[in-house]
């Protein structure tokens, strides 16, 4: 039983794979880099690695020291999972089991569930024997250890091999029944550190206890001693991101439905024009080369005829009223004119035909790079160049739908989301507040297509795509990566060094390249598109049009949105009839440290949407009715969150792959390669020279520097002369 267990390294990737080999689902291990910062998210337990002190190096004996913090009550000790370590080199598995088997809401799998049920009520010593007699645990443990050398160095008689090297030990910090316990398999009793404060989490107290322990061991030195290492057992972030993505995609569909419903109420004539437009699609699909230049100008005439009389094409969009959207569908199509053409003259060449993508990809530019947008702007593709009118002041309570309808999506590449006028030439303006309305009859068609794509996106299993396609029109996960901020090579960095959710010193390449982080240019580009570039105008528009984002943004990824028949959009308040527990139950489980409040809320709202029975028990909170501009701002917020979680999920998947690569490098046996390489050197006649060179270098390096500068004193001892044979 006590033979064959190998020593494991303190690596979060190794522990994560070990958890999977145990059969546990939904759990991973992260490394803690900073004890001063608060832990984000739920934590099941801490695994602390420290250097084993001299008088306790014998790993085969359990320490019998007892102090005031030791729990000697057999009922308390036997009801928790606390096992004595009776096997050398098994402290890593003991520490991991001490965390997992003391959590009530973790899917342990068949192996650990059987272990927990079998050892229920056992003494710590009996539980230690149970671990030693579990071949599944030993096999999983040794599968992630480095191979032992074939020939061990000769041992001195009476000296243990453990004493010849530095020994490190793992212990666990776990919250049980509202109190923080330290579970050390080499101690006879668990250590009770007491309860934590009402206004703090159990992790805060655990960090204080660990910092005090490190401070005592290092005699007050800074708390970054390399002899210590701390890891946290946390929920699997892949499940969290997948659940968030599901909720966000459902909410995206709800926002699109609300936007479509609002347009149907405010612009009922668009439904009729949409039907007539579909009947005239064959006429519009004719090649543009068959039309004369006069025919191209005729397509623009109805738009300009209803505007205020102007002298040139540069003032067309300056004062168009809302009635421009009521023009017949056959004449409302705008065509991009070459820069050299004029309104009254015939262009020298026909207008170029712009290759159009599908409707949802053509204008759904939330994830489009701003550099690409500027290139299109410089090339004259998709935007017209007309002077800007100064923005007009308006009151806070007026509902100017002429200004708010500007951001509705359109299939025409010549009309995109226009930013508000800031006094600079080159941007479009409206008669209401300096913007061109893009609410055209084919807006309903675009929203219908997006609703269909959103429904398809919900029905398809979640997968990570590195390029935008028909299945995910709005999500473009970046494939490029930036190097780590520290001078390191990604091929040599372990996956645990690349990034961690707990204040990692190295940043993930995918997160560094994520375009939807708060400081990214895409987020600022979206805000510029919505609210303009002027700071004062930005503040005013944030108050006016960012109301939906301010109200629903905090819960957009954790709760479902409810759309009423009257267009009121509100979050759902889940009752206790759902699968999740009530707040009181949640708080009691939170005292055990393994509740996972954030993840449970997400699971609750997801199941309430998937299951009709749970959906009926959900009650919508008081909501409000938002304008089209506010709904579009909320839609862009949802799209940014989706892109963000797609990138985070892709990062977790890539990190898990690197965990496996590091594990293969760690457990691979290089003896055969080394033997083959040495034999090849011997065949080439190079081995003898290399051995002589290395031996001579070692001899020169082995001379003490102090002896080189030491003055030699004359030897005054009398030396005997060599014996010479007398001649006979």
UniProtKB/Swiss-Prot annotation:
Domain ULD: 669-697
Motif (Non-classical PY-nuclear localization signal (PY-NLS)): 716-723
Region (Interaction with nucleosomal DNA forming a DNA clamp with ASXL1): 698-700
SUPFAM superfamilies for this protein: Cysteine proteinases
Modified residues (Phosphothreonine): 492
CDD domains in the cross-refs: Peptidase_C12_UCH37_BAP1
InterPro entries: Papain-like_cys_pep_sf, Peptidase_C12_UCH, Peptidase_C12_UCH_sf, UCH_C
Misc: Has the ability to ability to suppress tumorigenicity when expressed in NCI-H226 cells.
Quaternary organization: Core component of the polycomb repressive deubiquitinase (PR-DUB) complex, at least composed of BAP1, one of ASXL1, ASXL2 or (probably) ASXL3, and one of MBD5 or MBD6. The PR-DUB core associates with a number of accessory proteins, including FOXK1, FOXK2, KDM1B, HCFC1, YY1 and OGT; KDM1B specifically associates with ASXL2 PR-DUB complexes. The BAP1 deubiquitinase activity is not required for PR-DUB assembly.
Protein name (record): Ubiquitin carboxyl-terminal hydrolase BAP1
Organism whose genome encodes this protein: Mus musculus (Mouse)
């Amino acid at each position: 039983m006590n033979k064959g267990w190998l020593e494991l390294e303190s690596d979060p990737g190794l522990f994560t794979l070990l958890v999977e080999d145990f059969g546990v689902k939904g759990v991973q291990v992260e490394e803690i880099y900073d004890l001063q910062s608060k832990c984000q998210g739920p934590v099941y337990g801490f695994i602390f690695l420290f250097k084993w002190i001299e008088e306790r190096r014998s790993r085969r004996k359990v320490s019998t020291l007892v102090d005031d913090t030791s729990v000697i009550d057999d009922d308390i000790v036997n009801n928790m999972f606390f096992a004595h370590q009776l096997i050398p080199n098994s402290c890593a598995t003991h520490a991991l089991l001490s965390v997992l088997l003391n959590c009530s809401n973790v899917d342990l799998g068949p192996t650990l569930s059987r272990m927990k049920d079998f050892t229920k009520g056992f003494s710590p010593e009996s539980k230690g024997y149970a671990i030693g007699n579990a071949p599944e645990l030993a096999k999983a443990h040794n599968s992630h250890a480095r191979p032992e050398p074939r020939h061990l160095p000769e041992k001195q008689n009476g000296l243990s091999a453990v004493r010849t090297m530095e020994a490190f030990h793992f212990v666990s910090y776990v919250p049980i029944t509202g109190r923080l316990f330290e579970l050390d398999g080499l101690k006879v009793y668990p250590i009770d550190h007491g309860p934590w404060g009402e206004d703090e989490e159990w992790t805060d107290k655990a960090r204080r206890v660990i910092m005090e322990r490190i401070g005592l061991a290092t005699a007050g030195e800074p708390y970054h001693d390399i002899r210590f290492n701390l890891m946290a057992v946390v929920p699997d972030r892949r499940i969290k991101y997948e659940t968030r993505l599901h909720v966000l995609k459902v909410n995206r569909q709800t926002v699109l439905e609300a936007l479509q419903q609002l347009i149907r109420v405010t612009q009922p004539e668009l439904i009729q024009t949409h039907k007539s437009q579909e009947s005239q699609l064959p006429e519009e699909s004719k090649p543009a080369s068959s039309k004369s230049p006069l025919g191209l100008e005729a397509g623009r005439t109805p738009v300009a005829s209803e505007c205020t009389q102007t002298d040139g094409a540069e003032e067309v969009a300056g004062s168009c009223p809302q009635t421009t959207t009521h023009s017949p569908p056959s004449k409302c199509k705008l065509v991009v004119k070459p820069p050299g053409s004029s309104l009254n003259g015939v262009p020298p060449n026909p207008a170029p035909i712009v290759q159009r993508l599908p409707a949802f990809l053509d204008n759904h530019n939330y994830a489009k790079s701003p550099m690409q947008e500027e290139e299109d702007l410089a090339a004259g593709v998709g935007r017209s160049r007309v002077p800007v009118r100064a923005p007009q002041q308006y009151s806070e309570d007026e509902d100017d739908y002429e200004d708010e309808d500007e951001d509705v999506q359109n299939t025409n590449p010549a009309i995109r989301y226009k930013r508000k006028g800031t006094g600079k030439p080159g941007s479009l303006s409206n008669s209401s507040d300096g913007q061109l309305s893009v609410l055209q009859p084919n807006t309903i068609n675009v929203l219908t297509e997006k609703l269909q794509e959103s429904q398809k996106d919900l029905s398809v299993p979640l997968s990570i795509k590195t390029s935008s396609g028909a299945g995910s029109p709005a999500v473009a996960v970046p494939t490029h990566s930036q190097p780590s901020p520290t001078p390191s090579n990604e091929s040599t960095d372990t996956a645990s060094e690349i990034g961690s959710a707990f204040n990692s010193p190295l940043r993930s390449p995918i997160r560094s390249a994520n375009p939807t982080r708060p400081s990214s240019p895409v987020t600022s580009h979206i805000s510029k598109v919505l609210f303009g570039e002027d700071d004062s105008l930005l503040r005013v528009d944030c108050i006016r049009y960012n109301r939906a984002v301010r109200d629903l943004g905090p819960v957009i990824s954790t709760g479902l949105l409810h759309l009423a028949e009257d267009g009121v959009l509100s979050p759902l308040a889940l009752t206790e009839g759902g699968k999740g527990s009530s707040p009181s139950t949640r708080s009691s489980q939170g005292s055990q440290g393994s509740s996972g409040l954030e993840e449970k809320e997400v699971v609750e709202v997801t199941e309430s949407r998937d299951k009709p029975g749970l959906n009926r028990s959900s009650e919508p909170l008081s909501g409000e009715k938002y304008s089209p501009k506010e709904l579009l701002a909320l839609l862009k917020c949802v799209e940014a969150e989706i892109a963000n979680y797609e990138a985070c999920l892709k990062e977790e998947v890539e990190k898990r792959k690197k965990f496996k690569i590091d594990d293969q490098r760690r457990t691979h046996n290089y003896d055969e390669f080394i033997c083959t390489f040495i034999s090849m050197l011997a065949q080439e006649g190079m081995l003898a020279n290399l051995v002589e060179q290395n031996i001579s270098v070692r001899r020169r390096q082995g001379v003490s520097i102090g002896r080189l500068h030491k003055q030699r004193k004359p030897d005054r001892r009398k030396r005997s002369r060599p014996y010479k044979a007398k001649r006979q």
